[in-house]
Design a protein with these regions (language model features):
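Solvent-exposed coil/turn segments that connect beta secondary-structure elements
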Residues: 32-34, 119-123, 177-179, 185-187, ...
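Structural boundary/hinge residues at secondary-structure and domain interfaces
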Residues: 1-161, 166, 209-268, 272, ...
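Short, exposed beta-strand/loop patches in secreted or surface proteins that constitute
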Residues: 149-153, 171-174, 273-276, 418-423, ...
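A conserved glycine-rich beta-strand in the N-terminal activation segment of trypsin-fold
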Residues: 168-245, 433-513, 519-522
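Flexible, glycine/threonine-enriched loop-and-boundary segments that flank and lead into catalytic domains
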Residues: 376-378, 421-436
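C-terminal regions of mature proteins
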Residues: 397, 524-551, 555
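Short, solvent-exposed coil/turn segments at beta-strand boundaries
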Residues: 111, 156, 174-180, 281, ...
Length: 559
């Protein structure tokens, strides 16, 4: 009987979804179990703390278990059984772009071609019926109740096509064996059918994917891969999009876009991502693959230093937006080392731009061309963002104050500004008349470069033992950082988790919410912490947070 129960409750064997994805795809996202996603989310600390306060029913937590059980046994409505068994690959096969103009100026309208490829683990007839039913429902939702239906044949597979109100809009569905494909373009469906049938190579044959997938985990709840071709295609649009956020001047937009294009094309060659539920939260890993000559050039100067006690955190107040710690050997000479490594490996345009950037950076901090800081600074630099329009504050461990003193004087006097000394809580603060409100102060072994008000908050945090270094939630997640982490970032705000949970409450019509209980529960939700390492093949970042990218649920729900 036990053997019978084992086979009756065993999940259908998983298929390798990358064998359904065409090699020509720009990117794909893989989800192997929806029930695992539901079960993982409802087991997070954020869900367990906030769901009761928002009146979200326990039935949602049990839904994942029920779906998994129906998927294993095959008992239940066809759609429910398939939901419990299905594996999904979202495939990006292409991106079209067109320029447009609006009230706020010109912008780029991107139109991705994508396909949802679903392994139903069911019969061909059931998969075909499901494809037709779901495609018709989606078409009505997208185009209205009055829809037209067309059919065509592609190597024996029947394509169901629903034309949209414009020639460039359509919804297409097809099935192949137990696989269902639904897409916004017929070419995407045909490309996926070619891969599934063996008429075209699949992304499973991609050497980078085979070699590096293990770096982010082979059994993640969510996995994604952007190919080298995908990176190159995205780079065509990304610089212009980023530049338009930096400036509104057309000439400067063009300059920034061209520079970004030069650097990105010569640097990145792929991206891998995974998300997994661990320790009451979500662990996400990002591996940005770099071209071999660039990876070594970046990894060497950004080699992590032996991690100290991160004493700078005792100066960081709890009421901040986030902080980032740079823990790198010889941090004082980092810009020059990076420049020395990168310039020989990029083209002339990018090389000149990098030189100008380093010169400008040194000048901003009062450094003359002959100044060298390597032996004057420690390995710990902390950047603190207080939020809003406030400038970023910097905390630097200093080993040689006399060497730093003339540089600090030039920093405070930049642009002809005058500096004056004031005392705050027993600490001398040098305040500049510069328009950006810059000021400086030494507290113990650390130099603070910030505004006068920010420095006061840091002095108070240190004097009252109220810095984030005393936060038990932070201490817990800092217990086991990757050994080679050169950058550590922390974000205490967990509003993204709250917004996700409120979206779930709205969709499920839960309630009423207990506001006071919700605020208390939110204080117990773990903050976000990430670690970045630079390796000889790329950059890997591990993020540990309350809900991770699943916070996008709030956007999908329109909340």
């Amino acid at each position: 009987m036990g053997v019978s129960a084992y086979f009756a409750l065993r999940r259908p064997p998983r298929v390798e979804m990358d064998r359904y994805v065409p090699a020509s795809a720009l990117a794909y996202v893989e989800i192997n179990s929806f029930s695992d996603i539901v079960g993982g989310l409802t087991s997070t600390k954020a869900w367990q703390e906030l769901a009761p306060a928002l009146g979200i029913p326990d039935e949602i937590s049990r839904a994942g278990l029920a779906a998994d059980l129906m998927g294993r046994t095959g008992v239940g409505r066809d759609e429910a059984v398939i939901a419990g068994r299905a594996q999904l690959a979202l495939v990006l096969t292409g991106i079209e772009a067109e320029g447009a103009a609006g009230e706020e100026g010109a912008y780029i309208n991107l139109k991705p071609r994508f396909a949802a490829v679903v392994e139903t683990h069911s019969s061909h007839d059931l998969a075909r019926r499901l494809a037709e039913k779901q495609a018709a429902a989606l078409a009505r939702e997208a185009f209205g109740e009055s829809i037209n239906e067309e059919r065509s044949d592609y190597f024996g597979a029947q394509l169901l096509i629903f034309p949209g109100p414009r020639p460039d809009r359509q919804l297409v569905a097809a099935s192949a064996g137990s696989v269902v494909i639904i897409s916004n373009h017929i070419a995407a469906v045909e490309t996926c059918l070619d891969a599934i049938s063996g008429r075209a190579p699949t992304i499973a044959e991609n050497a980078t994917l085979s070699e590096r997938r293990g770096e982010v985990g082979t059994d993640a709840a969510v996995f994604a891969f952007v190919t080298e071709a995908g990176i190159e295609r995205l780079i065509e649009f990304l610089p212009a999009l980023l530049a338009s956020r930096v400036t509104t001047d057309p000439d400067r937009i063009s300059t920034v876009a061209n520079l970004s294009d030069h650097l990105l094309k010569q640097t990145a060659s792929g991206l891998l991502y995974s998300a997994q539920f661990e320790s009451g939260g979500v662990t996400e890993k990002y591996l940005t693959l770099l071209r071999p000559n660039m990876a070594a050039a970046i990894a060497d100067p950004l080699k992590s230093a032996t991690r100290a006690n991160l004493e700078s955190l005792d100066l960081v107040p709890s009421q901040i937006e986030d902080f980032t710690i740079l823990n790198v050997e010889g941090v004082g000479e980092l810009p020059d080392r990076m420049l020395k490594q990168l310039v020989p490996r990029v083209d002339v345009v990018a090389g000149l731009a990098l030189r100008e950037f380093v010169v400008s950076l040194r000048k901003q901090f009062g450094l003359e061309p002959t100044d060298r800081l390597g032996d004057a600074l420690g390995n710990e630099v902390t950047l603190v963002r207080f939020g809003g329009a406030e400038p970023t504050a910097m905390i630097v461990r200093v080993k040689d104050r006399p060497k730093i003193a003339p540089i600090l004087d030039r920093y405070l006097a930049e642009g002809g500004a005058k500096a004056s000394a004031v005392e705050y809580n027993g600490v001398q603060v040098s305040v500049s008349s510069h328009e950006d409100g810059r000021a400086a102060a030494f507290v113990g072994e650390f130099l603070i470069l910030a505004t006068r008000d920010q420095i006061a908050k840091m002095i108070d945090a240190h004097a009252n033992n109220a810095g984030v270094g005393r936060d038990e939630r932070l201490a817990q997640v800092l217990n086991s950082p990757p050994a080679r982490a050169a950058i550590i970032s922390y974000k205490p705000d967990v509003r993204d988790a709250a917004e996700m949970m409120m979206a779930v409450a709205a969709v499920t019509k839960s309630g009423p919410a207990d506001q006071s209980a919700g605020e208390a529960a939110l204080a117990r939700v773990p903050p976000s912490l990430s670690f970045t390492e630079f390796r000889d093949y790329g950059i890997i970042t591990e993020s540990r947070s309350a809900v991770g990218s699943f916070s996008l649920i709030s956007s999908l729900a329109g909340k």
